[in-house]
């Protein structure tokens, strides 16, 4: 029995099909067609209503299929007509749009866009679908080639009965909490595995554990890479993209990826080849238009969130990893950008890589892009298998959505124990009724705890054993390939000296904006001018003038002892996340980083003090002679480097800005009071503090430089040869830095 269509809709669809047929047929019969005054074909049907135009992507796909194009004036005319004529395929009231199949049934060769397509190509072509997109530049809309894979070690990852526990220390006792319980699964090269679950379900913990970034002392079960345990060699084969985009805000996109390439790519590649790899990754990720834009941060404008995420991914795929792990790569992105990010991961997987990603709440389009799925709930495994079979599995145990909903939302509701819009399995309902508990009073449905217990038990009894048996199958690799996974030797991308040079240059570029900010320059120069005005051409021929000038020298010692300390304490705490990330990836040796970090500040640190002394020295009437001027500047430089060392040590020991600032304030205040200007006679039992004060030694050296020809003792301070003070400052310079380095060595890598 056939159903009758509404007469209006039927007639409308037939009329428009006939109009389209007549338009195209007339256009084919006449190379130039019948044109109106504006150059538009007279037979073209007018755009009616709110119909949709042929999409840009659809047009590109059609043009890509054309076997050839006309040339000459005819081509120009047809292209002009094509630009002016937008064929609108209006959806009729029945909701059915004119499909490509119906166009193919016309049996015609399309020419209104300036190219010919035989009927057989039309009939063989696929329907228009936005799901066929490949990663493209979001702004420019240009297709990008797939990730150009190079030969790499394939990694077959298996994990069986994985557990993870942490000890929570309280005031009087400690409690052991289980984060993961009996997680099993596998993922092979060419596959994308998604880890799904509500917040706090253990997704990030499992991801870090699979990446080898969690100490094995607190884990249980087995994790194998090509049937071999984790080794340090694998660090150079694993890419790990953190949830937060840990990037330097003042570096451009190109600089960020270039430095990553120079540090991480093997020594066999030249500097130019590494630079070219960075440019290739920029092109692969569609970042050409923003490659010279700063990354940006909380206080610096930069690239967009989607571009920043792609830079983070580029930092990892630049090494051509065998295993790529990503923590929430779509977090904070719009649906289109998120889809393109997942499609990019598919391209990487298709090149023979193993890809694992956590995902919080994907759209339905994203969900169907994953090959495998792990669903976690309260640290337990609720499902592992093909993502396309997840709904069938839960339907088989009696859990089906009662309303139309996103599959991912359905699974997350189950993982949370929320079954308000989900059918209640009869077995679960009977169990709750028999126990007279585990039921919510308001809805009358089983409680989240009862739902969770049922789902865990259902998976363990129906699926778990079968999946565990599959893990026993050997991986399809020869023994030589397997043996590569067990090498214990690390593979540094470059030698120690090159690591130092690269990190030194990176540090200069990143912090050049901080040192020459208008606020800092204004602060230093305004202080210098005020000092110059207060001590304008002071006269040391009188005792009062000599004492006043000694006060100026003490202020210089205090100012350039105080200023560097509170700048340096921020160094390591602010870069802790970056240091954790790069050390976990074995990008460089800690010693190379530490030396580069502490020396890259020095060239910039000497510019402002030099300007300060040039203003103060000549305005206040200090000894006008090259010898005392340069000795005074050298003394201030020694004070700055020693004070920096103290700030670095405090910051590295505490790694907390609030605590470090408090401790630095107390320490600097103590050193200032013990500096020999305020208190002339210090009690013996506490007099040793002055010898730890860089203010004290700097003050004595400045007095010697200025007044060694005038007096033996000034303001209660005896002037000697100054070697003791120089030696004390040098010991502080190296001693404080050694303490800071040892503190960093003891710092655990937090993932």
Curated annotation (Swiss-Prot):
InterPro entries: AAA+_ATPase (IPR003593), ABC2_TM (IPR013525), ABC_transporter-like_ATP-bd (IPR003439), ABC_transporter-like_CS (IPR017871), ABCG_dom (IPR043926), ABCG_transporters (IPR050352), P-loop_NTPase (IPR027417). GO terms for biological process: response to water deprivation; transpiration. It is a multi-pass membrane protein. Keywords: ATP-binding, Membrane, Nucleotide-binding, Transmembrane, Transmembrane helix, Transport. The keyword Manganese does not apply. Residues 26-81 are annotated as: Disordered. Residues 157-403 form the ABC transporter domain. One of its GO terms (molecular function) is ATP binding. The chain crosses the membrane at residues 516-536, 552-572, 602-622, 634-654, 666-686, 722-742. It is found in: Membrane. Pfam families: ABC2_membrane, ABC2_membrane_7, ABC_tran. Its main location: membrane. ATP binds at residues 197-204. GO terms for cellular component: membrane. SUPFAM superfamilies: P-loop containing nucleoside triphosphate hydrolases (SSF52540). Residues 498-707 form the ABC transmembrane type-2 domain. It comes from the Eukaryota. PANTHER family: ABC TRANSPORTER G FAMILY MEMBER 22 (PTHR48041:SF94), ABC TRANSPORTER G FAMILY MEMBER 28 (PTHR48041). Belongs to the ABC transporter superfamily. ABCG family. Eye pigment precursor importer (TC 3.A.1.204) subfamily. This is ABC transporter G family member 22. It comes from Arabidopsis thaliana. The lineage of its organism: Eukaryota, Viridiplantae, Streptophyta, Embryophyta, Tracheophyta. The gene is ABCG22.
């Amino acid at each position: 029995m056939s159903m009758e269509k509404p007469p209006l809709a039927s007639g409308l669809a037939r009329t428009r099909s006939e109009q389209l047929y007549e338009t195209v047929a007339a256009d084919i019969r006449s190379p130039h067609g019948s044109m109106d005054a504006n150059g538009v074909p007279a037979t073209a049907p007018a755009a009616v209503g709110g119909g949709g135009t042929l999409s840009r992507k659809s047009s590109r796909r059609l043009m890509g299929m054309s076997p050839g194009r006309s040339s000459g004036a005819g081509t120009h005319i047809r292209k002009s007509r094509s630009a002016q004529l937008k064929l609108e395929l209006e959806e009729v009231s029945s909701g059915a749009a004119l499909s490509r199949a119906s166009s193919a049934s016309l049996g015609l060769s399309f020419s209104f866009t300036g190219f010919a397509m035989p009927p057989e190509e039309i009939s063989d072509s696929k329907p228009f679908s936005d799901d066929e997109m490949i990663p493209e530049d979001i702004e420019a809309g240009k297709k990008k080639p797939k990730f150009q894979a190079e030969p790499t070690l394939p990694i077959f990852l298996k994990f069986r009965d994985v557990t993870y526990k942490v000890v929570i220390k309280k005031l009087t006792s400690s409690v052991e909490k289980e984060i993961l319980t009996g997680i099993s699964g596998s993922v092979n090269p060419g596959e994308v595995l998604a880890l799904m679950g509500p917040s706090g379900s253990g997704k990030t913990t499992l991801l870090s554990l699979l990446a080898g970034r969690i100490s094995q002392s607190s884990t249980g079960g087995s994790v194998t890479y090509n049937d071999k345990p984790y080794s340090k060699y694998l660090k150079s084969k694993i890419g790990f993209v953190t949830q937060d985009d840990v990037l330097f805000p003042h570096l451009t996109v190109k600089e960020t990826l270039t430095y990553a390439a120079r540090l991480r790519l093997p020594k066999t590649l030249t500097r130019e080849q590494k630079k070219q790899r960075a440019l290739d990754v920029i092109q692969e990720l569609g970042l050409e238009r923003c490659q010279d834009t700063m990354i940006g941060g909380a206080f610096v404008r930069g690239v967009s969130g989607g571009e920043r995420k792609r830079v983070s991914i580029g930092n990892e795929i630049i090494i051509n990893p065998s295993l790529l792990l990503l923590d929430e790569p779509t977090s904070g992105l719009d649906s289109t950008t998120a889809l393109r990010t997942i499609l990019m991961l598919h391209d990487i997987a298709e090149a023979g890589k193993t890809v694992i990603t956590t995902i919080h709440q994907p759209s339905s389009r994203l969900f169907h892009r994953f090959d495998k799925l792990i669903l976690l709930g309260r640290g337990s495994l609720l499902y592992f298998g093909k993502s396309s079979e997840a709904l069938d599995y839960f339907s088989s145990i009696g859990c089906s959505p009662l309303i139309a909903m996103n599959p991912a939302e359905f699974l997350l509701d189950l993982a949370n124990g929320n079954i308000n819009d989900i059918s209640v399995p009869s077995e679960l309902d009977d169990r709750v009724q028999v126990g007279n508990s585990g039921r919510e009073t308001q809805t009358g449905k089983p409680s989240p705890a009862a739902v969770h217990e049922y789902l865990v038990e259902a998976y363990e009894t129906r699926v778990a054993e079968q999946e565990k048996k599959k893990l026993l199958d050997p991986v399809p690799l020869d023994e030589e390939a397997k043996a590569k996974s067990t090498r214990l030797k690390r593979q540094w991308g470059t030698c120690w000296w090159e690591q130092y040079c690269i990190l030194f240059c990176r540090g200069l570029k990143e912090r050049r904006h901080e040192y020459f900010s208008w606020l800092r320059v204004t602060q230093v120069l305004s202080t210098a001018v005020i000092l110059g005005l207060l001590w304008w051409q002071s006269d040391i021929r009188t005792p009062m003038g000599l004492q006043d000038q000694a006060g100026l020298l003490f202020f210089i010692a205090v100012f350039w002892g105080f200023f560097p300390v509170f700048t340096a304490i921020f160094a390591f705490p602010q870069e802790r996340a970056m240091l954790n990330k790069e050390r976990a990836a074995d990008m460089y040796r800690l010693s190379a980083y530490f030396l580069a970090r502490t020396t890259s500040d020095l060239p910039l640190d000497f510019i402002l003090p030099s300007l300060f002394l040039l203003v103060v020295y000549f305005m206040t009437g200090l000894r006008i002679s090259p010898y005392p001027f340069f000795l005074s500047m050298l003394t201030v430089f020694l004070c700055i480097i020693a004070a920096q060392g103290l700030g670095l040590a405090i910051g590295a020991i505490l790694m907390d800005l609030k605590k470090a600032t408090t401790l630095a304030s107390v320490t600097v205040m103590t050193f200032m009071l013990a500096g020999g200007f305020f208190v002339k006679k210090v009690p013996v039992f506490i007099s040793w503090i002055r010898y730890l004060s860089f203010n004290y030694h700097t003050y004595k050296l400045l007095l010697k430089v200025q007044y060694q020809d005038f007096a033996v003792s000034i303001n209660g301070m005896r002037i000697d040869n100054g070697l003791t003070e120089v030696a004390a400052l040098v010991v502080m310079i190296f001693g404080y830095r050694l303490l800071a380095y040892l503190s960093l060595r003891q710092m655990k890598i937090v993932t």
